Amino acid sequence: MSKQAQFNKHRVAGLLVAMGVVYGDIGTSPLYVMKAIITGQGGMQAVDEKFMLGAVSLVFWTMTLLTTVKYVLIALNADNHGEGGIFSLFALVRHRARWLVIPAMIGGAALLADGALTPAVTVTTAIEGLRDVPAYVQLFGASQNTIILITLGIITLLFMLQRFGTNTIGKLFGPIMLGWFTFLGVSGFVNLVQDWTILRALNPYYAWLLLISPANKVGILILGSVFLATTGAEALYSDLGHVGKTNIRLSWPYVKVCLLLSYFGQAAWILGPGQAIQGHVNPFFAMLPASLTMAAVIFATLAAIIASQSLISGSFTLVSEAIRLKLFPRLLTTYPGKAVGQMYLPVVNWGLWGVTSMLVIFFQTSERMEAAYGLAITLTMLMTTTLIYAFLRQKRLPLIGAGLLTGFFATIEVIFLIASAAKFWHGGYVAVGLALLIFLVMAVWYRGEQIVRQHNHPLSLRQYQDQLAKLRDDQTVDKFQTNVVFLTSRMDGDQVERKVLYSILDKWPKRADVYWFVNVTITDEPYTAEYTVDTLATDYLVTVKLYLGFRVRQDINRYLRTIVRDLMATGRLAAQKQTYSVTSGRDVGDFRFVIIEEKLENGSRLSRLDRLVIETKLMIKKYATTPAKWFGLEFSEVTLETVPILFNEIPALPITERQR
């Protein structure tokens, strides 16, 4: 096969992957956008030609300005070594200003909240299409309860399958979504040819006319429904690392054309002869021939499942990045698939399932879900715009240029936020409340880390080198282990956390041949795996600094094995011959890892607010995974110790001896 043929093969494969991974959310929008718009106006009987021209024009220009220009053309350039998404962007610009962590946390929390609502609204809307199938109505009737049960069954099965990975079935996502977009385009085009005049909506004049028209019953609030057409744009940016910007940019024109054909086709059908339908209908299913409705429902359900899968996988990635950026507590993470970056977080998975299921039961219908959908994601988009401004300034774009560009998009997004704010009382409070809860967890965790760092001052290993050497040779002290490893969250040269030396010398003197001090630094690059080592001119003290990307698994034990071999190969660490071993020629001694847990003492000198933050952080920590599991030490020798979180600031309590 020639190089050109190989390139074309890989390019086609990349485009198919992009279809299956990136466009699930935005690709299911035609299921409910036009329905939400006409429902807000009062139903089919309340719309006319001017209204539909304005509505489709708003959809077209929203997709063009926000999805195409902001995300596809601009945001995809703000990649962190190929990775996208709000936390990858934050990792890229966080050194510019401390306050940038606030929009990152708000945006990330809102995106996670959106991840719970998307499966509910997309799957429910798809299944509700069964009402247009006569055979289904004859068998089960038109009861919404049956729709809810089917929806809950599909959602539950989807979340149950997450623990097994999506390697095999994931290969089908691309072809299925390619077929879905083609179906959208063809079905829309068939109806569009009945009334080409709807193409006048390409003129933004009609969009403006609708916004100011007295015939528009909801005024600017119509933008809350229009915005649903572009909610998947943020997911598009978040999935950059899975497919690459080139594949997204090459596949987006086809996807956009198919989406627009569906929207324009639905509008043409609504304005067509004989469509004076009373009440609320879904034009997406209603415009199809009756013989295709069942096939369309199956196709739409598959697309909704794929869209939900993308949001679930994206939520796993988002939380994983937040953990490594120390914005979220450590959660148990497994890697069921062979693909790079594929992960499974049980707490996130079942938490999403619980919230999604409750949303389906609470809202009952897709119409009510649509009324609540989109509010949270407008916040994420606005926060992403804020971080893009910092990125553009970092790239030396002049202040005026960066301000005008991001200010333009921020203005649009603020307008959409105001329009979507009306959704708060119609169910939007659920998404906002969930986002607020996630944000508070992030804020408490981040602030708690800051407080501990501010109050715990490091100590120099060189200053205590003589004591450590003496302890090493002191035969009156029982040997703790050949190699003892301390994981320290803070290390600068020979400076380590005070609690580490306190553990070795004060709490329980630990005699060992070699003392290891290991620190993990999370880099802004996603897949870094490097280390530095310093023996401090001794044969018994070793400081190791691991530099791991924010998407790299922190499997400390396995990394340490590699480092030990490297040190022995270069003569910096003496061989530790073993008398007893089932491994022939083993020259590495036994290891024990010491993990030091921190507790808050009653006497700590903290303000009430800081104390509340620390207490809340420690409470949250109880539900997080253990450090041993997080650092891959489940099968290693591990000792767990407890020290006061701020033990160097606890004053002695006065007490007087009673005279006899």
From Swiss-Prot:
It holds the Pfam family K_trans. Its main location: membrane. The chain crosses the membrane at residues 14-34, 56-76, 99-119, 139-159, 173-193, 208-228, 257-277, 286-306, 343-363, 372-392, 399-419, 424-444. Keywords: Cell membrane, Ion transport, Membrane, Potassium, Potassium transport, Symport, Transmembrane, Transmembrane helix, Transport. Belongs to the HAK/KUP transporter (TC 2.A.72) family. HAMAP family: Kup. This is Probable potassium transport system protein Kup 1. It comes from Lactiplantibacillus plantarum (strain ATCC BAA-793 / NCIMB 8826 / WCFS1) (Lactobacillus plantarum).
